[in-house]
Amino acid sequence: MKLVLIPGVILCGADVAQAVDDKNMYMHFFEEMTVYAPVPVPVNGNTHYTSESIERLPTGNGNISDLLRTNPAVRMDSTQSTSLNQGDIRPEKISIHGASPYQNAYLIDGISATNNLNPANESDASSATNISGMSQGYYLDVSLLDNVTLYDSFVPVEFGRFNGGVIDAKIKRFNADDSKVKLGYRTTRSDWLTSHIDENNKSAFNQGSSGSTYYSPDFKKNFYTLSFNQELADNFGVTAGLSRRQSDITRADYVSNDGIVAGRAQYKNVIDTALSKFTWFASDRYTHDLTLKYTGSSRDYNTSTFPQSDREMGNKSYGLAWDMDTQLAWAKLRTTVGWDHISDYTRHDHDIWYTELSCTYGDITGRCTRGGLGHISQAVDNYTFKTRLDWQKFAVGNVSHQPYFGAEYIYSDAWTERHNQSESYVINAAGKKTNHTIYLKGKGRLGIDNYTLYMADRISWRNVSLMPGVRYDYDNYLSNHNISPLFMTEWDIFANQTSMITAGYNRYYGGNILDMGLRDIRNSWTESVSGNKTLTRYQDLKTPYNDELAMGLQQK
């Protein structure tokens, strides 16, 4: 059960000046002023960040997580970004009203951009069966976006498959009156920072080893952006944006059990973004958008206590979407078709992971674990068709109605692959292999159909509005029929939108995590030479859901 209380108070004040007109009469006017403040949380449970507010707010590494950091509904992972790992540029996990970070829904122009491959696991540790992932399918650079909307309560029925909240990012449309090219560059580095490190962590931090996190005592960050807006013909134009965010981190290559450092190496963390939207205003009734999007990230890691454990981990996402807005005489119809490819991978430099009692690495000898576990990856292709019909407002007696209806179909084609055979074992005192496991080369697929229907209506009488709605979801993975009711009421006390009370009840069903099925496939490629292999099967699972009771008060 999620209980949400949303207060909202907006107070404005200014010095009053007086002026004298030709008739010697005094009149009051407010001097011109500009107010800079964090974006408030409106009473209806959503926060809208325009491109202007995105430019004003501090966005750190340029991720959506950084943009939402100051929102009172959002809580950041306190262990992910600390003074110990300032060189990291990956998006941070966010929790909305205390829900799991991997149960948020991310969208780009209304199409799902959620990575449901393995969003609950962001570990950078070596693994033969578990691939690190994140709930954000695209690592967007917010400086290239037109706006971002966070829905944290009273979420409309058109959004589903989440327990926490919804983050909807919009890519810029071209503006015929504002053709321009924009270049940007930012940089920061460890030499410009002063970090206060706990005495228990200071030695490991200065070495640049991997302890509770991947320490980054020596780093350089560089951020490059290029964007342009251009009209190509009458009522037809394009916007595009490119960015590279890069962090170069110097860490220890290997640290022995007694703290001896055997060399240092530079590890690179890169996020590339490319976004483009072609827009055609065909007529007063028809508007077409063609959107292309790409983000790619890669990060180099090693485990400083394991020699020769270098590996590259990353994410690549790309897709396209076509939108058509149709203005009918009695309604507005929006149709969207899209395809998105989202993938995660881990590529080790070595294919054998083993522990031996006596090994030599440089000038260091003793017990050690070394090597890697080969190359594994997983990906999903999402094919989306969705449509929404917004009826024009009409009245029945003294009561007005503004209904809308929608449907969505997503086919998810997921696959996982181990690109080469790898193995792990322990060499005992007698020089024999124990705990020997072989991970076979292989590839497997998993296909899921997702169906959605929804409808809602805004019913208004005088200064009171009711918004009932219902959403239906079904997929052939868990085969659950999920019905989500929505009810919201709004009272505009003085009928001038200065004092408003909102209350409601909603149910939100979470999304599927494909890793459950993909891990079944990967586990089937595992052979235990010195024991029985373990297999896990998932069946008869229910879809998790949250019930929300919310009340909000807003005073302007």
Regions found by a protein language model. Give the residues of each.
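Hydrophobic, lipid-facing positions within transmembrane beta-strands of outer-membrane proteins
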Residues: 92, 165, 220-226, 270-276, ...
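Solvent-exposed loop segments that connect transmembrane elements
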Residues: 197-210, 251-265, 304-308, 347-375, ...
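Short strand-turn segments of transmembrane beta-barrel domains in outer membranes
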Residues: 135-138, 146-155, 165-227, 260-267
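Transmembrane beta-barrel wall of Gram-negative outer-membrane proteins
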Residues: 179-182, 213-298, 315-328, 332
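Structural signature of Gram-negative outer-membrane beta-barrels, strongest in the C-terminal barrel
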Residues: 380-384, 398-412, 441-556
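Outer-envelope beta-barrel architecture signal
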Residues: 64, 102-104, 144, 177-181, ...
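Periplasmic N-terminal accessory/gating domains of Gram-negative outer-membrane beta-barrel systems
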Residues: 22, 39-156, 166, 170-172, ...
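Face-selective signature of the C-terminal outer-membrane beta-barrel domain
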Residues: 275-299, 310-478
